[in-house]
């Protein structure tokens, strides 16, 4: 079931926030573009109020990504979007019960290429059904189908929450024996069919060869807040991740990297 907010109310809130000096707003809806019709109506309504606020969301489902949606998001003022696909391999997507297939992932990539909004692609390696072959299939997708203008974020392992489908899978496979109370500290699932060292090496090599790829460790690097502040004073607009390629090149010149 969905709890939907009225598009007019949301648009009015954006206008009010803009009057208070807020120039950047991010939608943290779990799946922004589902229901699809509601997302279209929302973007159409925001576009009509002609706000100058920069909008973002990194919660798009590839199943509902098409030219119509991305077009109205551009008109509404979105300057950054993200698609959480987790994998491009059908074997993994089916085990995760994502509700979409690799075909939808590839189709979404073609749509994104036809538009100007920069896109952050989010992958999680090591889920149920993951093998060396599925890892390489997902990396091939990222390397061949994600534009250099866009960014890929690679994460390894999927956090297990008590009572979820992943929790049941991990216990059935003998990977997880902790009680729910013992899982307050994060516990992660990694497919027994993939060796961690091999996976880390494959992902590391792909990131090293592609300046628009990164891992979550980059987000916590101590010098990033200073770079963010410098970008603000230089007038560089969010989202900062869209500058990953340029930033990594500069850091490599200084002998560092993300």
Each predicted region: which residue ranges?
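Hydrophobic, Leu/Ile/Phe/Ala-enriched alpha-helical segments that form helix-helix packing faces
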Residues: 46, 142-146, 203-207
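Flexible glycine/acidic-rich beta-alpha junction loops that bind and position SAM and/or redox cofactors
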Residues: 37, 91, 95-96, 125-133, ...
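Bilobed periplasmic-binding protein-like "clamshell/Venus-flytrap" ligand-binding domains
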Residues: 119, 152-153, 216
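Residue-level marker of structural boundaries
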Residues: 19, 101, 147, 175-176
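Radical SAM [4Fe-4S] cluster-binding motif and immediate context
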Residues: 1-120, 125-127, 140
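Structural recognition of alpha->loop->beta junctions
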Residues: 70-81, 137-155, 181-182
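Radical SAM enzyme core and accessory elements
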Residues: 21, 165-170, 175-258
């Amino acid at each position: 079931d969905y709890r939907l907010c009225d598009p007019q109310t949301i648009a009015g809130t954006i206008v009010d926030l803009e009057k208070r000096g807020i120039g950047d707003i991010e939608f943290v809806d779990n799946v922004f573009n589902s229901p699809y019709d509601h997302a279209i109506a929302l973007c159409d309504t925001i576009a009509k109020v002609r706000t100058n606020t920069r909008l973002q969301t990194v919660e798009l489902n590839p199943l509902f990504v098409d030219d119509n949606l991305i077009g109205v998001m551009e008109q509404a003022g979105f300057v950054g979007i993200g698609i959480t696909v987790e994998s491009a391999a059908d074997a993994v997507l089916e085990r995760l019960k994502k509700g979409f297939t690799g075909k939808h992932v590839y189709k979404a990539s073609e749509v994104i290429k036809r538009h100007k909004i920069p896109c952050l692609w989010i992958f999680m390696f090591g889920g149920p059904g993951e093998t060396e072959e599925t890892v390489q299939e997902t990396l091939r997708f990222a390397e061949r189908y994600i534009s250099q203008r866009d960014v890929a974020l690679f994460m390894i392992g999927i956090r297990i929450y008590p009572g979820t489908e992943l929790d049941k899978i991990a216990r059935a496979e003998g990977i997880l024996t902790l009680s729910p109370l013992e899982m307050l500290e994060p516990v992660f699932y990694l497919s027994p069919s993939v060796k961690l060292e091999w996976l880390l090496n494959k992902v590391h090599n792909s990131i090293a060869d592609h300046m628009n790829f990164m891992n979550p460790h980059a987000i916590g690097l101590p010098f990033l807040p200073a770079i963010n502040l410098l970008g603000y004073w230089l007038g560089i607009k969010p989202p900062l991740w869209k500058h990953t390629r340029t930033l990594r090149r500069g850091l490599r010149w200084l002998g560092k990297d993300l």
